[in-house]
Amino acid sequence: MKNKIKSTALATLLTGTALLTGTLPTGSEAAESPFAVAMEKMEIDGLNIAYREAGDPDNPTVLLLHGFPTSSHMFRELIPELAAKYHVIAPDYPGFGASDMPDAASYDYSFANAADIVTQLIDAKDVDDYAVYLMDYGAPVGYRMFAEHPERVTGFIIQNGNAYEEGLRDFWDPI
């Protein structure tokens, strides 16, 4: 038992030292490896929006939209697996994860606003088209993005996604 405690303490010390001395990749350094996941922030509409990104931007992009009450953290094991073949972006909506949480009295926490924020993020990342994985709360966000720009979405992966009539456009009427 003493050896296990010593081993754990040593591993913790070495990891902490590596983080403090900058010998572990972070930020843009981490993004250079297709398997490393960079946690970044971008200012959009006055809010700091957090997102995880990995993989080669020249590869097809997969956008991962989280549910409620989660964040991009839920994809932490999936992102490195996808990054071998895809460029992966997983944002945190306003009020979720590491993104800013504006006061509800002054900010409209709607699916439309979340979709707009994510669209601005992928525009700033120069992503022209993407496949989207969505679930739960991410479904109405992703559906709104598709309704606005169907030409950009190359495919859907839907897990337990809800489709609400509220907010859907005339685009869906023929279906």
Please tell me what each predicted stretch does.
Residues 76, 119, 143-147:
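Short, hydrophobic alpha-helix immediately C-terminal to the catalytic nucleophile
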Residues 100-103, 167-172:
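Short aromatic-enriched loop/helix-cap "lid" or pocket-rim segments at secondary-structure transitions
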Residues 2-61, 84-86, 127-128:
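Alpha/beta-hydrolase fold catalytic core
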Residues 44-45, 52-54, 90-135:
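Active-site loop/oxyanion-hole signature of alpha/beta-hydrolase fold enzymes
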Residues 47, 53-101:
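Conserved HGGG/HGGXW glycine-rich cap/lid loop of the alpha/beta-hydrolase fold
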Residues 40, 64, 89-90, 133, ...:
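Conserved Rossmann-like nucleotide-binding pocket used by diverse enzymes
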Residues 30, 171-175:
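Short, intrinsically disordered, charge-balanced linker/junction segments flanking boundaries
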